[in-house]
Amino acid sequence: MKLTKILLGALLLGGFTACNDIEQADRYEPIEVTAKKNVLIEDFTGQHCVNCPKAADEIQRMQADSTIGEHVIAVSIHGGSMSKHDSETSGLGLATDEGETYNSRWNVKSWPKGLVDRTGGLQDYESWNASVVSRLAETPKVNITADKVAYDEETRTLKLVTSVSGNADVTG
């Protein structure tokens, strides 16, 4: 019995000395992403939502990322029970009728949630980065370029001239 304890102790001691000491920077190998498109994140949020600032921070972090940032487009949509309307807040509410329609359409029941390029359904903000990286690696079926953009502030009219070129055959 004593010999077993000694052997077990020696094995454990030997096991600890066999461990490699890997520096923190060497433990993670980032995957290079060559963005071929832009990705839209629709962030369902609300002024009563206590975790929604974390989702906003995640979007800000992605947009600050030198590899993917310029390809991440985010839209915050206020609607549902976590949002405030102007009538509730003396004109300071951010909820809109359109936001309510989007929340209803996507059946948002908890916040924050988001859609990444409207694929994969509603996601928690912790999943957005992986979804964005995955979508950025895809080749878009078409390239859309805004050739001329003109916005008239007085009439709130946007005029946009675009050109579209195909990258793949599309049927249907």
What are these regions (language model features)?
Residues L3-L40, V50:
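Bacterial Sec-dependent N-terminal signal peptides
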Residues A56-Q60, G99, N129:
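Extracytoplasmic/secreted envelope proteins and their assembly/folding machinery
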Residues A18-I31, V133-G172:
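Non-globular targeting/processing and membrane-anchoring segments
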Residues T101, V108-N143:
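Non-catalytic, surface beta->alpha helical segment in thiol-disulfide oxidoreductase systems
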Residues I68-D97:
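Thiol-based oxidoreductase modules, predominantly thioredoxin-like and allied folds used
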Residues F44-E58:
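Conserved redox-active cysteine motifs that mediate thiol-disulfide chemistry
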Residues L40-D43, I73-H78, P112-D117:
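Structural recognition of the beta-strand scaffold that forms the well-ordered cores
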Residues K54, Q60-I68, T119:
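Sec-exported extracytoplasmic/periplasmic mature domains
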